[in-house]
């Protein structure tokens, strides 16, 4: 599906959702994630809230979309977009949220994830960047620890 078509469809759906249920934009983390499945169905999930004892947390929209896909016996994702329900801007999902999409089906390494209304990248490039950042961070930690150990008394 063309870039601007999928983005426009999801944005329109998000705007309608907020008009009907304004409370859904409950925080800056309120989002909608839409996944274009292999059969061209659009499966969406909206951020939700969970409670453990008296502590609340947010369930990511991406996770909710994956659960919806699983419930519909679908696993193959072609495109994925996450929008803020506050200002309808494109939100790049966290790597942990991308990994659940990739884990659903080996072919999802080709899923394109929107990074702006007019641009997307393969899911693997976002995960590779995270892996590289993590490796650099780990190397820096090891260097720092080695330096600290060198000066230990």
Please give the residue ranges for each predicted region.
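Generic hydrophobic secondary-structure packing signal
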Residues: 10, 29, 57-61
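Short beta-strand scaffold segments in enzyme catalytic cores
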Residues: 27-38, 124
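Residue-level structural signal for beta-strand termini and adjacent loop
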Residues: 47-48
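C-terminal binding/interaction regions
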Residues: 2-24, 72-153
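A short, polar/charged loop-to-alpha-helix boundary motif
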Residues: 51-67
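Hydrophobic "anchor" residues
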Residues: 41-42
């Amino acid at each position: 599906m063309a870039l601007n078509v999928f983005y426009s469809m999801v944005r329109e759906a998000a705007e309608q959702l907020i008009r009907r249920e304004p409370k859904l934009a409950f925080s800056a983390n309120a989002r909608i994630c839409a996944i274009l499945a292999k059969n061209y169905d659009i499966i969406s999930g909206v951020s939700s809230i969970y409670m453990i004892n008296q502590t609340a947390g947010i369930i990511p929209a991406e996770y909710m979309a994956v659960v919806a896909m699983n419930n519909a016996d679908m696993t193959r994702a072609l495109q994925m977009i996450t929008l803020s329900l506050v200002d309808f801007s494109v939100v790049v999902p966290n790597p942990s949220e991308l990994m659940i999409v990739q884990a659903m089906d080996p072919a999802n390494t080709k899923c394109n994830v929107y990074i702006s209304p007019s641009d997307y990248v393969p899911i693997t490039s976002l995960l590779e960047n995270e892996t590289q950042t993590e490796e650099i961070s780990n190397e820096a930690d090891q260097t720092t620890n080695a330096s600290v150990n060198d000066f230990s008394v």
